[in-house]
């Protein structure tokens, strides 16, 4: 599913990512652990073609992410609240994301049902813009939107950072 080949990214003199070769197979679940500044987020941004690699490439389902956008159809991601359109309500944002994947409003509503417990009555129906939500609720909105279209590949960066233990 994912092949990382000779991937390098430097910021000035600091080598942030240096991966000779790594394969992630369909169905694998992988967690990256490392110190702050170790390159985890940089790797995710390279995988999502949000950063240009200095060398190498990332291939998802035989698609080089830097050469085509077809991989986006089966990939969901949430890196940080910069992914959110914070002048929308959560409902508007979910419908916007759904529309990008060809989902009707009714389908989006149906796909939100399994997330009701996660939202804890604090996200939907609040008549607030995303910018006015807590960091934890923004995190929930981002995670849910990344999963809305049932992606084959889900990339989440520090997904539990701002979430309550409950």
State where each predicted segment sits.
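The feature captures the beta-strand-to-loop junction immediately N-terminal to the Walker
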Residues: 33-35
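Catalytic Walker B motif of ABC-type/P-loop ATPase nucleotide-binding domains
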Residues: 154-158
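Conserved ABC transporter NBD signature motif
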Residues: 56-71
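A short, proline-enriched helix->beta-strand linker immediately N-terminal to the Walker B motif
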Residues: 148-152
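Helix-to-loop junction immediately C-terminal to a conserved catalytic motif
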Residues: 48
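Conserved ABC ATPase signature
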Residues: 129-134
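Conserved structural motif at the start of ABC-family nucleotide-binding domains
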Residues: 2, 17-19, 72
